[in-house]
Amino acid sequence: MTVTVLVPGETGRAALAGQEWADLVVYDPDHDWPEPASSAEVLVVPPAAHTADRLLAAMPELPKLRLVQTLSAGVELWEGKLPDGVLLSNARGAHGGSTAELAATGLLAVYRQVPQFLANQAGHKWDQHPTETLDGKRVLVLGAGDLAQSLRSQLEPFGATVTLVGRSARAGVRSFDEVPELLGGHDAVVLMVPYNDQTHHLADAGFLARMPDQAVLVNVARGPVVDTDALVAELTAGRLRAVLDVTDPEPLPADHPLWDAPGVLIFPHVGGNTTGMTDRAWRVAAEQIGAFAAGQDPPNLVS
Protein backbone atom coordinates (compact mmCIF):
# COMPACT_ATOMS: atom_id res chain seq x y z
CA MET A 1 0.00 0.00 0.00
CA THR A 2 1.22 3.50 -0.85
CA VAL A 3 0.75 6.25 1.72
CA THR A 4 1.11 9.98 1.33
CA VAL A 5 3.76 11.24 3.74
CA LEU A 6 4.33 14.87 4.69
CA VAL A 7 8.05 15.40 5.33
CA PRO A 8 9.68 18.56 6.76
CA GLY A 9 12.00 19.91 4.09
CA GLU A 10 14.14 18.40 1.37
CA THR A 11 16.14 16.42 3.94
CA GLY A 12 13.03 14.34 4.53
CA ARG A 13 12.47 13.81 0.83
CA ALA A 14 16.05 12.64 0.40
CA ALA A 15 15.87 10.36 3.43
CA LEU A 16 12.74 8.53 2.26
CA ALA A 17 13.43 8.64 -1.47
CA GLY A 18 13.15 5.22 -3.06
CA GLN A 19 10.66 3.85 -0.51
CA GLU A 20 8.06 2.23 -2.74
CA TRP A 21 5.35 2.67 -0.12
CA ALA A 22 5.81 6.46 0.09
CA ASP A 23 4.27 9.29 -1.91
CA LEU A 24 6.28 12.18 -0.49
CA VAL A 25 5.07 15.75 -0.03
CA VAL A 26 7.50 18.34 1.32
CA TYR A 27 6.20 20.95 3.76
CA ASP A 28 7.69 23.88 5.67
CA PRO A 29 6.87 23.67 9.41
CA ASP A 30 6.73 27.48 9.60
CA HIS A 31 4.20 27.93 6.78
CA ASP A 32 0.79 26.68 5.63
CA TRP A 33 0.41 23.17 4.29
CA PRO A 34 1.16 22.73 0.57
CA GLU A 35 -1.87 21.94 -1.58
CA PRO A 36 -1.33 18.13 -1.79
CA ALA A 37 -1.28 17.89 2.03
CA SER A 38 -5.02 17.25 2.26
CA SER A 39 -4.43 13.64 1.16
CA ALA A 40 -1.62 12.99 3.66
CA GLU A 41 -1.98 9.98 5.96
CA VAL A 42 1.40 10.36 7.68
CA LEU A 43 3.03 13.49 9.08
CA VAL A 44 6.70 13.48 10.08
CA VAL A 45 7.33 16.25 12.61
CA PRO A 46 10.69 17.93 13.30
CA PRO A 47 12.21 17.91 16.80
CA ALA A 48 12.14 21.73 17.04
CA ALA A 49 9.81 22.66 19.90
CA HIS A 50 8.91 26.08 18.47
CA THR A 51 6.94 24.52 15.58
CA ALA A 52 4.85 22.09 17.64
CA ASP A 53 1.97 24.40 18.57
CA ARG A 54 1.56 25.63 15.02
CA LEU A 55 1.55 22.11 13.58
CA LEU A 56 -0.92 20.87 16.20
CA ALA A 57 -3.27 23.75 15.43
CA ALA A 58 -3.08 22.97 11.70
CA MET A 59 -3.63 19.20 11.96
CA PRO A 60 -7.44 19.45 11.58
CA GLU A 61 -6.71 20.62 8.03
CA LEU A 62 -5.39 17.10 7.29
CA PRO A 63 -8.60 15.04 7.15
CA LYS A 64 -6.88 11.77 6.20
CA LEU A 65 -4.09 11.97 8.80
CA ARG A 66 -3.62 8.66 10.64
CA LEU A 67 -0.01 8.72 11.95
CA VAL A 68 2.34 11.34 13.37
CA GLN A 69 5.97 10.22 13.35
CA THR A 70 8.56 12.09 15.43
CA LEU A 71 12.30 12.28 14.79
CA SER A 72 13.06 12.22 18.52
CA ALA A 73 12.44 9.76 21.32
CA GLY A 74 10.69 12.36 23.49
CA VAL A 75 7.02 12.88 22.65
CA GLU A 76 5.88 15.29 25.37
CA LEU A 77 5.12 17.94 22.72
CA TRP A 78 2.64 15.63 20.99
CA GLU A 79 1.31 12.95 23.33
CA GLY A 80 -2.34 13.48 24.26
CA LYS A 81 -2.68 16.42 21.85
CA LEU A 82 -3.35 14.74 18.49
CA PRO A 83 -6.76 14.60 16.79
CA ASP A 84 -8.88 11.55 17.61
CA GLY A 85 -7.86 8.46 15.71
CA VAL A 86 -4.32 9.65 14.93
CA LEU A 87 -1.49 7.37 16.07
CA LEU A 88 1.81 8.61 17.48
CA SER A 89 5.16 6.90 16.92
CA ASN A 90 8.62 8.04 18.01
CA ALA A 91 12.27 7.55 17.01
CA ARG A 92 13.19 5.33 19.95
CA GLY A 93 16.47 3.60 19.18
CA ALA A 94 17.95 6.40 17.08
CA HIS A 95 19.67 8.29 19.88
CA GLY A 96 20.01 5.80 22.73
CA GLY A 97 23.68 4.96 22.26
CA SER A 98 24.87 8.55 21.98
CA THR A 99 22.76 9.80 24.89
CA ALA A 100 24.02 6.96 27.07
CA GLU A 101 27.56 7.79 25.97
CA LEU A 102 27.16 11.36 27.20
CA ALA A 103 25.86 10.13 30.57
CA ALA A 104 28.88 7.84 30.90
CA THR A 105 31.18 10.68 29.83
CA GLY A 106 29.71 12.92 32.50
CA LEU A 107 30.21 10.35 35.24
CA LEU A 108 33.80 9.74 34.20
CA ALA A 109 34.45 13.50 34.07
CA VAL A 110 33.09 13.99 37.59
CA TYR A 111 34.90 11.06 39.15
CA ARG A 112 38.22 11.84 37.44
CA GLN A 113 37.80 15.59 38.12
CA VAL A 114 38.18 16.57 34.47
CA PRO A 115 36.70 20.09 34.97
CA GLN A 116 39.20 20.77 37.76
CA PHE A 117 42.14 19.57 35.68
CA LEU A 118 40.98 21.72 32.75
CA ALA A 119 40.86 24.74 35.05
CA ASN A 120 44.34 23.88 36.30
CA GLN A 121 45.58 23.63 32.73
CA ALA A 122 44.10 27.04 31.89
CA GLY A 123 45.91 28.45 34.92
CA HIS A 124 49.18 26.63 34.13
CA LYS A 125 48.88 24.84 37.47
CA TRP A 126 50.40 21.38 38.07
CA ASP A 127 48.31 19.87 40.89
CA GLN A 128 48.85 16.12 41.15
CA HIS A 129 46.33 14.39 43.41
CA PRO A 130 44.24 11.21 43.48
CA THR A 131 40.70 11.07 42.10
CA GLU A 132 37.76 8.73 42.31
CA THR A 133 37.13 6.00 39.76
CA LEU A 134 34.04 4.54 38.12
CA ASP A 135 35.24 1.10 39.15
CA GLY A 136 33.08 -0.15 42.02
CA LYS A 137 30.50 2.62 41.75
CA ARG A 138 26.83 1.68 42.19
CA VAL A 139 24.72 3.35 39.51
CA LEU A 140 20.92 3.50 39.66
CA VAL A 141 19.29 4.14 36.28
CA LEU A 142 15.68 5.29 36.26
CA GLY A 143 14.62 3.80 32.97
CA ALA A 144 14.83 0.37 31.39
CA GLY A 145 14.52 1.06 27.67
CA ASP A 146 17.13 1.21 24.94
CA LEU A 147 18.90 4.22 26.52
CA ALA A 148 19.20 2.49 29.88
CA GLN A 149 20.28 -0.81 28.36
CA SER A 150 22.92 0.98 26.31
CA LEU A 151 24.22 2.83 29.38
CA ARG A 152 24.50 -0.40 31.33
CA SER A 153 26.54 -1.98 28.54
CA GLN A 154 28.87 1.04 28.57
CA LEU A 155 29.33 1.30 32.36
CA GLU A 156 29.75 -2.33 33.35
CA PRO A 157 33.12 -2.77 31.56
CA PHE A 158 34.44 0.02 33.81
CA GLY A 159 33.56 -2.08 36.84
CA ALA A 160 30.39 -0.24 37.82
CA THR A 161 27.33 -2.07 39.15
CA VAL A 162 24.20 -0.91 37.32
CA THR A 163 20.62 -1.27 38.54
CA LEU A 164 17.80 -0.50 36.08
CA VAL A 165 14.35 0.66 37.21
CA GLY A 166 11.21 0.26 35.11
CA ARG A 167 7.47 0.68 35.53
CA SER A 168 7.22 -2.89 36.76
CA ALA A 169 9.73 -5.39 38.12
CA ARG A 170 11.04 -8.11 35.82
CA ALA A 171 14.24 -10.03 35.26
CA GLY A 172 17.13 -7.57 35.64
CA VAL A 173 14.82 -4.61 36.32
CA ARG A 174 13.54 -3.21 39.62
CA SER A 175 10.18 -1.48 40.04
CA PHE A 176 9.66 2.27 40.42
CA ASP A 177 7.90 1.54 43.69
CA GLU A 178 11.32 0.57 45.06
CA VAL A 179 13.08 3.84 44.16
CA PRO A 180 12.82 5.50 47.60
CA GLU A 181 14.62 2.58 49.25
CA LEU A 182 17.12 2.18 46.40
CA LEU A 183 18.36 5.78 46.35
CA GLY A 184 20.39 5.55 49.54
CA GLY A 185 22.39 2.58 48.31
CA HIS A 186 23.75 4.07 45.09
CA ASP A 187 26.61 6.42 44.28
CA ALA A 188 24.99 7.84 41.15
CA VAL A 189 21.42 8.18 39.87
CA VAL A 190 20.80 8.57 36.13
CA LEU A 191 17.43 9.89 34.93
CA MET A 192 16.35 8.36 31.61
CA VAL A 193 12.57 8.57 31.96
CA PRO A 194 10.07 10.14 29.55
CA TYR A 195 8.68 13.48 30.66
CA ASN A 196 5.00 13.51 31.62
CA ASP A 197 2.75 14.44 34.53
CA GLN A 198 4.02 11.47 36.55
CA THR A 199 7.70 12.37 36.13
CA HIS A 200 7.41 16.14 36.58
CA HIS A 201 9.77 17.01 39.46
CA LEU A 202 10.39 13.32 40.07
CA ALA A 203 13.75 14.35 41.52
CA ASP A 204 12.35 16.76 44.10
CA ALA A 205 13.77 17.80 47.47
CA GLY A 206 12.68 14.56 49.12
CA PHE A 207 14.17 12.44 46.33
CA LEU A 208 17.48 14.29 46.48
CA ALA A 209 17.60 14.10 50.28
CA ARG A 210 17.56 10.28 50.06
CA MET A 211 20.72 10.24 47.92
CA PRO A 212 23.98 9.69 49.84
CA ASP A 213 26.45 12.50 50.46
CA GLN A 214 28.58 13.20 47.36
CA ALA A 215 26.28 11.13 45.12
CA VAL A 216 25.98 12.25 41.49
CA LEU A 217 22.65 13.04 39.82
CA VAL A 218 22.73 12.68 36.02
CA ASN A 219 19.80 14.05 34.00
CA VAL A 220 19.64 13.11 30.32
CA ALA A 221 15.83 12.97 30.32
CA ARG A 222 14.09 16.36 30.33
CA GLY A 223 14.82 19.38 32.51
CA PRO A 224 11.53 19.47 34.47
CA VAL A 225 12.08 15.90 35.70
CA VAL A 226 14.31 17.64 38.28
CA ASP A 227 13.21 20.34 40.72
CA THR A 228 15.92 22.85 39.82
CA ASP A 229 15.61 24.91 42.99
CA ALA A 230 15.96 21.80 45.15
CA LEU A 231 19.01 20.68 43.16
CA VAL A 232 20.67 24.11 43.40
CA ALA A 233 20.19 23.98 47.17
CA GLU A 234 21.90 20.57 47.41
CA LEU A 235 24.75 21.65 45.12
CA THR A 236 25.28 24.91 46.99
CA ALA A 237 25.48 22.98 50.25
CA GLY A 238 28.19 20.81 48.66
CA ARG A 239 26.29 17.63 49.45
CA LEU A 240 25.50 16.39 45.93
CA ARG A 241 27.09 16.63 42.50
CA ALA A 242 25.34 16.66 39.13
CA VAL A 243 25.73 16.12 35.39
CA LEU A 244 23.00 17.83 33.37
CA ASP A 245 22.36 17.54 29.65
CA VAL A 246 18.96 19.18 30.14
CA THR A 247 17.83 21.98 32.43
CA ASP A 248 14.69 23.73 33.61
CA PRO A 249 14.46 26.38 32.29
CA GLU A 250 16.04 25.58 28.93
CA PRO A 251 18.02 27.22 27.47
CA LEU A 252 19.48 28.11 30.84
CA PRO A 253 19.53 31.93 31.28
CA ALA A 254 22.99 33.43 31.63
CA ASP A 255 22.21 34.73 35.13
CA HIS A 256 20.76 31.48 36.48
CA PRO A 257 22.41 30.31 39.74
CA LEU A 258 22.80 26.78 38.37
CA TRP A 259 25.71 27.95 36.19
CA ASP A 260 27.82 28.82 39.22
CA ALA A 261 26.69 26.08 41.57
CA PRO A 262 29.61 23.95 42.80
CA GLY A 263 29.90 20.38 41.61
CA VAL A 264 27.77 20.63 38.46
CA LEU A 265 28.76 19.82 34.87
CA ILE A 266 26.32 21.27 32.32
CA PHE A 267 25.93 20.21 28.67
CA PRO A 268 23.59 22.25 26.39
CA HIS A 269 21.21 19.36 25.52
CA VAL A 270 23.58 17.60 23.13
CA GLY A 271 23.17 13.98 24.23
CA GLY A 272 21.74 12.85 20.90
CA ASN A 273 23.32 15.60 18.82
CA THR A 274 26.14 13.65 17.22
CA THR A 275 27.47 12.83 13.79
CA GLY A 276 24.87 10.77 11.93
CA MET A 277 22.00 11.81 14.22
CA THR A 278 19.70 12.87 11.39
CA ASP A 279 20.38 9.74 9.34
CA ARG A 280 19.65 7.51 12.34
CA ALA A 281 16.40 9.30 13.10
CA TRP A 282 15.15 9.03 9.53
CA ARG A 283 16.16 5.37 9.37
CA VAL A 284 13.98 4.64 12.39
CA ALA A 285 11.17 6.79 10.98
CA ALA A 286 11.26 4.81 7.73
CA GLU A 287 10.86 1.55 9.67
CA GLN A 288 7.83 2.92 11.50
CA ILE A 289 6.10 4.34 8.43
CA GLY A 290 6.88 1.22 6.41
CA ALA A 291 5.15 -0.92 9.01
CA PHE A 292 2.14 1.41 8.98
CA ALA A 293 1.98 1.26 5.18
CA ALA A 294 1.95 -2.54 5.44
CA GLY A 295 -1.11 -2.40 7.68
CA GLN A 296 0.81 -3.04 10.91
CA ASP A 297 1.27 -0.98 14.06
CA PRO A 298 4.58 0.89 14.04
CA PRO A 299 7.06 -0.88 16.37
CA ASN A 300 7.59 2.40 18.24
CA LEU A 301 3.88 3.10 18.68
CA VAL A 302 3.35 5.42 21.66
CA SER A 303 -0.40 5.94 21.52
Residue ranges and their predicted role:
Residues 1-50:
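N-terminal glycine-/charge-rich "phosphate-binding" loop or analogous flexible N-terminal tail
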Residues 85, 135-139, 214:
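Phosphate-coordination loops involved in phosphoryl transfer and adenosine-cofactor binding
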Residues 89-102, 116-117, 250-303:
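C-terminal helix-to-coil terminal segments
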Residues 117-150:
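Glycine-rich NAD(P)-binding loop of Rossmann-like domains
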